[in-house]
Amino acid sequence: MSDKVYPVTAEWSKSAYVDAAKYKSMYESSVSEPDKFWGEHGKRIDWVKPYTKVKNTSFDPHNVSIKWFEDGVTNVSTNCIDRHLATLGDQTAIIWEGDDPNESKHITYKQLHEEVCRLANVLKSYGISKGDTVTIYLPMIPEAAYAMLACARIGAIHSIVFGGFSADSLGGRIEGCKSKLIITADEGYRGGRKVPLKVNADAAIKKVDGIVETMIVVRRTGGKVAWTEGRDVWYDEALAKASPDCPAAEMNAEDPLFILFTSGSTGAPKGVVHSTGGYLVWASMTHQYVFDYRPGEVYWCTADVGWVTGHSYIVYGPLANGATTLMFEGVPSYPTISRFWDVVDKHQVNIFYTAPTAIRSLMGAGDGPVKATSRKTLRVLGSVGEPINPEAWEWYYRVVGEERCPIVDTWWQTETGGILISPLPGATALKPGSATQPFFGVQPQVVDAAGEVLEGPCSGNLVIADSWPAQMRTLFNDHERFVQAYFSAYPGKYFTGDGCRRDEDGYYWITGRVDDVINVSGHRLGTAEVESSLVAHIKVAEAAVVGYPHDLKGQGIYAYVTLMTGIEPSEELRKELVSWVRKDIGPIASPDIVHFAPGLPKTRSGKIMRRILRKIAEKEFSALGDTSTLADPSVVDDLIRERAN
């Protein structure tokens, strides 16, 4: 745990929405009088028919039910577009930056309105109506946002499948929500390479025969694609014939807005269902307060819309707030390792939100590529996706933000809909590696294995004691699995699946997934702690730690280590790293095996696939499970070869 504290500076607090005192009073009223608090803040979005009921929720395992603003009627698309037209019609809604640095475009709110309405009318012409599901399988191009908002406009439920997923994964997700229509592209671009999309979509549809009736295809690369007459439609040709005006469907607050399939640790992917009203209130409010977003600023979240971060913090939250949001098709390392910072300068980005894995890989390339750019417009930096180790936090703060930008280290999940624990720039003193304090209305608790709520400084499992507006409502067509997965371990509480430590200041430190705990000779060790220690070593760029069967200790510690550019692995360095961790955490945390790895297996969103690393450490090479989400499968082959020898 880092013992450094960075107090709120006068610069951060002078025009922030909340300071420490206001946070305290708002938080207290949000948990003591939720109906009053959310009754007021629910009005931040426009309602066709205002709600009279605010909160109606139960975490009782026999009757899990979550309803917010349940008698209100609204539309997400009009909240993200139409309500801004009178005052912000000519303002840029979306800045799109292509994979190729020479390709970018600005889309105003007026243009966004026209594109979304045309696509909504096309969807209707192909028989899509309120309650139908539409699968979106697109690269990071503006059409992905248009498709989401067009579905929302007519009350269709979208299910986005990340463009890096295989035909098998796509087919399973189409079958999971029975989409009659899919929107895809001929191909995508990523890091200078073409990514097959229509080929995968064709293969997926074959696997789930009889479900998909229509495939709308965006021309992205102009590459040759197979064509099925009567089913396949070119996006541009269909839109050219459609009206640029489409009335918005009146949606109940509790109508589903989207389904997002997330991998279960076992079994089929889970279709997380998010609502309309509560979700949008939360996405817009967290976007404003957590990033301290101010009108006219340029906001960039580097995620993909295929992940929940892209849903909430590229599209819905920012656009509901009338923001200018940046969509990036490329990768941080193409054409050069300074790409992120070049984009920041090119588009004068004020708020930048990315993942620890990207920060660590950029840190591995040294300070030079960052310092070659200006970044003077940056005001707030954010981190999302996994706990950020203090070493990477410090680098991000010192080198990228030049010690003038607060870092909001945000903790949340696909299931939570939006940020639950995070600093607020004008209110929260920062501790590198800590997600700090809960957002309004969020009641975290730390419990022990028996479910006892722990007070004061402690370590245990993180649960949330009561509901918040953006909480997932159910798993698609499987409410029983929803109750089982999230409410049965600690009855009456939402179980996050994450381990957590709370310090003497009441700050929360996420220690990683509960299944990422190693039991060494009866001592429970969070893998995140050992990883942070390794990454703090000057020669280490990235580390992933897993447990493996050990004759004496029960479990041993297996550390995969990627070294900084230019550093060669050696037996001396291996010993040095073992003693480094031993000195930093204690003998109990000393790695038993240090495996120098040129790369780690990651999903396209940058998460390290520890499940695969565990299997390799255990030498269970034939039981790796689903590897379709890997960004670079060759990494796994290399690791297996090295482990086998």
From Swiss-Prot:
Example GO biological process: acetyl-CoA biosynthetic process from acetate
Keyword Endoplasmic reticulum attributed: no
Protein name per its UniProtKB record: Acetyl-coenzyme A synthetase
Family: Belongs to the ATP-dependent AMP-binding enzyme family.
The reaction(s) this protein catalyses: acetate + ATP + CoA = acetyl-CoA + AMP + diphosphate
GO CC terms, sorted: cytosol
Post-translational note: Acetylated. Deacetylation by the SIR2-homolog deacetylase activates the enzyme.
Annotated residues for binding of ATP: 385-387, 409-414, 498, 513, 524
NCBIfam families, alphabetized: Ac_CoA_lig_AcsA (TIGR02188), PRK00174.1 (NF001208)
The protein's required cofactors: Mg(2+)
Positions carrying N6-acetyllysine: 607
GO molecular function: acetate-CoA ligase activity; AMP binding; ATP binding; metal ion binding
EC number: 6.2.1.1
Positions bound to Mg(2+): 535, 537, 540
HAMAP family reported for this sequence: Ac_CoA_synth (MF_01123)
EC top class, as a word: ligase
PANTHER family in the record: ACETYL-COENZYME A SYNTHETASE (PTHR24095:SF243)
Reported function: Catalyzes the conversion of acetate into acetyl-CoA (AcCoA), an essential intermediate at the junction of anabolic and catabolic pathways. AcsA undergoes a two-step reaction. In the first half reaction, AcsA combines acetate with ATP to form acetyl-adenylate (AcAMP) intermediate. In the second half reaction, it can then transfer the acetyl group from AcAMP to the sulfhydryl group of CoA, forming the product AcCoA.
Keywords, comma-separated and alphabetical: Acetylation, ATP-binding, Ligase, Magnesium, Metal-binding, Nucleotide-binding
Binding site for CoA: 190-193, 309, 521, 582
CDD domains: ACS (cd05966)
Highest taxon of the lineage: Bacteria
InterPro entries to which the protein is assigned, alphabetical: Ac_CoA_lig, ACAS_N, AMP-bd_C, AMP-bd_C_sf, AMP-binding_CS, AMP-dep_synth/lig_dom, ANL_N_sf
